[in-house]
């Protein structure tokens, strides 16, 4: 798969995930804005053509994290001798975002706790919370029925 297709594929997937995701934690929201596509927030910029002009212009918002990594790797694979100077500039903003995310994670204990659990652990935690909510809802329905019975 070519780099433009990878960029497009991951841009769409990340955008769909970010549209459906509601983050209640401010630290996670800030990290998400660093890593998730910024197509709604920033104008698109054109990335430069490769040396041999074999690829067409590719447009991508500057804050897209995953697609930028794939594009940089594609450039390295395509022309490993010419990318040493371009690598610094093309991945500089990626390193900057990683450093900012790391700083945010170090500052916020709650975010670290949220991200510390694995997917399986979160599935168990969510199942437990749903069970607790069902029990509480049943208690509330029983109380409502008792109140209704007493008032009638």
From Swiss-Prot:
Subcellular compartments: Nucleus
GO molecular function, one term: transcription coactivator activity
Residues in coiled coil: 98-150
Keywords: Activator, Coiled coil, Nucleus, Transcription, Transcription regulation
GO biological process, one term: negative regulation of transcription by RNA polymerase II
Family: Belongs to the Mediator complex subunit 9 family.
Function: Component of the Mediator complex, a coactivator involved in the regulated transcription of nearly all RNA polymerase II-dependent genes. Mediator functions as a bridge to convey information from gene-specific regulatory proteins to the basal RNA polymerase II transcription machinery. Mediator is recruited to promoters by direct interactions with regulatory proteins and serves as a scaffold for the assembly of a functional preinitiation complex with RNA polymerase II and the general transcription factors.
Protein name per UniProt: Mediator of RNA polymerase II transcription subunit 9
Organism per entry: Candida glabrata (strain ATCC 2001 / BCRC 20586 / JCM 3761 / NBRC 0622 / NRRL Y-65 / CBS 138)
Gene: CSE2
């Amino acid at each position: 798969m070519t780099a433009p297709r990878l960029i497009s594929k991951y841009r769409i997937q990340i955008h769909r995930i970010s549209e459906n995701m509601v983050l209640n934690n401010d630290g996670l929201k800030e990290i998400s804005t660093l890593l998730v596509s910024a197509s709604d927030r920033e104008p698109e910029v054109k990335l430069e053509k490769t040396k041999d002009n074999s690829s067409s212009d590719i447009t991508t918002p500057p804050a897209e994290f995953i697609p930028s990594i794939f594009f940089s790797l594609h450039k390295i694979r395509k022309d490993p001798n010419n990318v040493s100077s371009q690598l610094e500039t093309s991945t500089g903003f990626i390193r900057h975002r990683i450093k900012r995310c790391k700083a945010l994670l170090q500052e916020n204990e709650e975010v670290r706790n949220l991200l510390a659990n694995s997917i399986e652990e979160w599935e168990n935690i969510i199942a437990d919370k749903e069970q607790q909510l069902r029990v509480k809802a049943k208690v509330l329905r029983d109380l409502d029925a008792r109140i209704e019975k007493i008032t009638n």
